[in-house]
Amino acid sequence: MRAREPRAPTLTAMNPPSRDFRSHTPGFWADATEAEWNDWRWQLRHRITTLAQAEQHLRLTPTEREGLLLTAHKLAFGVTPHYFNLIEADNPDCPIRRQVIPLAGEAVITPGEMADPCGEDGHMPVPGLVHRYPDRVLFLVTDRCASYCRYCTRSRVVSGVGEQELETDFEEIYAYLQKHTEVRDVLLSGGDALLLSDNKLRAILTRLRAIPHIEFLRIGSRVPIFLPQRITPELCAMLKEFHPLWMSVHVNHPRELTTEVRDALGRLADAGIPLGNQSVLLAGVNDNPDTMRALIHKLLRCRVRPYYLYQCDLIHGSAHLRTSVAKGLEIIEALRGHTTGYAVPQYVIDAPGGGGKVPVSPGYVVYHDNEKVVLRNYEGRIFEYPEKPGAPSTLVRPETILDY
């Protein structure tokens, strides 16, 4: 009898080990059924949006109460049940809490702060489209988010209670893009594009894909972190139809990467969507090397490459959340060379007033002239690299090479 051939191993996608990944379900919503909890629309309907609701679950400080009262007239307050469960109820310094619970300091405008720190309104040729860079545009498809970050650079237009209304003229945008053949890259943002229904998002992507010179599409989203239930198999299958399509997610602290978020990111990655992360450097959230190192390592385990670390924009009322640029450089220097290169994000400042992203790096070039570059490596050691080739030398004479 012939021996049975060994069965080939079955290859399956594996989630990263459960170490460091936790679920906080159901938390404050113990009465929710599993079906309700996993329904992204249920999550949106049950967001915490008022001072009274927040006080039911958190021991609020006086400055938090004052900050919550301010949200009737500026950037709204709203947190999904999934994300609210991550907040430490008795710790006002909780890094999750600092990102979404407003403080009275939001009413204090310090020198240099602006309503539109990135100068987007001045680069908006048609309503809802920002054309600041030569070959790419920012398409603001909605003014709503799953939860509202207190450092939001578009707080003037996001959430419906800001200083301005977002007025996006979709047909005028499509006409502009048809005409401007230099545009090869469109980034969908807002607000958050993934809050749109599958059908609405498909309609936008279809119109963009019909424009021949647009090479690839991007979506910037915090939904996989605030509302991982939205990342359904149906959504992923639809997005897969529009490749090449990339996605930038927004994670600031390792605790945000729960088991549900890990699984949502895995579904996007399995759909062939390259994932990058954009963090904002925030005081009391991620402004130390250990926290940032834990975050970037955890992101890589979720198949997300750390892409940008932003200096917090000079948005009105953000002084209590901003760090010094020196702190950002210190963090990058603590990472560069000490961990995987793929894990180290590029530290950037969005130049105030509309200058665009400017990369900021520690001083690894000590000296540079026409003869040489003097370099400092991550250990502080000094090296020289010649700018011009020296005198030629021949290691092997051509006539000595045997012809076989």
Predicted feature residues:
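Flexible, acidic/Gly-rich N-terminal and inter-domain linker regions that tether
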Residues: 2-131
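Conserved, mostly hydrophobic/aromatic
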Residues: 83, 149, 307
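Short, charged beta->alpha transition segments
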Residues: 124-127, 137-140, 170-177
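Canonical Radical SAM [4Fe-4S] cluster-binding loop centered on the CxxxCxxC motif
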Residues: 131-168, 219
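Mobile, glycine- and charge-enriched loop segments
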Residues: 151-152, 181, 262-287, 378-404
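Conserved AdoMet/S-adenosylmethionine-binding subsite of the radical SAM
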Residues: 171-185, 194-339
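C-terminal accessory regions of radical SAM enzymes
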Residues: 332-404
